[in-house]
Amino acid sequence: MSNDSIHWEARYLPAGPPRLLGWNVPAEELIHIPEHWLVYPEPNPSLHYLLALLYILFTFLALLGNGLVIWIFCAAKSLRTPSNMFVVNLAICDFFMMIKTPIFIYNSFNTGFALGNLGCQIFAVIGSLTGIGAAITNAAIAYDRYSTIARPLDGKLSRGQVILFIVLIWTYTIPWALMPVMGVWGRFVPEGFLTSCSFDYLTDTNEIRIFVATIFTFSYCIPMILIIYYYSQIVSHVVNHEKALREQAKKMNVDSLRSNANTSSQSAEIRIAKAAITICFLYVLSWTPYGVMSMIGAFGNKALLTPGVTMIPACTCKAVACLDPYVYAISHPKYRLELQKRLPWLELQEKPISDSTSTTTETVNTPPASS
């Protein structure tokens, strides 16, 4: 069935049966929409409006949270450490991920592909840059945490090394956004209710299948493996360290080898382990649905991918942009102190960190990390 015939049938259905997706799309724009979506009934307008309101909430929370992170980390001298440059890079990714949501919101309030292919390409390019950039930054933060905690004497990255890492992150990320928009490999197309856009995972060609498998490997699997590996190593290191301390204390006939300052920090190592689990969970929760959906579209049963189902992964990806600033930075004591200093009306009541805190604790208090 050709795009033109689908368009004709959608416009001239007799009164009674629901209109099909794409009924209000100009004929010249239909070529940009995978035929898969054009056989589904148009959703109730209230679903469009509900999603638009949800995205307005996501946008407000993400811009506020990530904007505060960028402001505080750049303004506070005590927070301008090499490790925190990764946190700022992640906040920039999450901030700009939500900059594109007005396109989705406008399309939703107009119940369809209102901004056309140009809006779609802008939406997808920004989404690819920020989504893949955030994934690789998460992996870099995992390595930084592992290196700092496992090798506290010589494992900390210098400012120059972190800058090099960030340059490499964007060098790795940018081609995945440019290739589809320039028509070099893959393409960006509308999906779901035709209000959002992503890379094409539905067209039944070898080129698209290879592209989907490649981007799935390089933008999802590799960061995921690195994150899980480095955080599992952190947890293993913490467990072994605690075990060694207990055994040494037993040999010396004392209850603990920790100083009062370390005791009052309430086992910072445990906080690292908890942060690690949270980070892995958030990454899996936010990006796995999208990864699974794209693989089903390219290699599985496409009938499983209804418009409503495909809107769920899009929402989970946006939700994590709201959560990242809270997991990475707002739980960070030094960040909270600086926030309290600049915005006292928040009444955070964060206690100043003692200078006598152990090396391990200081390592932990580099911003706790998050998909």
Swiss-Prot record:
The modification N6-(retinylidene)lysine is found at K318. Residues 74-84, 143-161, 231-278, 324-371 are cytoplasmic. Glycans are attached at N3. Disulfide bonds join C120-C197. Phosphorylated on some or all of the serine and threonine residues present in the C-terminal region. It is a multi-pass membrane protein. GO terms for molecular function: G protein-coupled receptor activity; photoreceptor activity. One of its GO terms (biological process) is visual perception. It is found in: Membrane. Visual pigments are the light-absorbing molecules that mediate vision. They consist of an apoprotein, opsin, covalently linked to 11-cis-retinal. This is Opsin, ultraviolet-sensitive. It comes from Apis mellifera. The gene is UVOP.
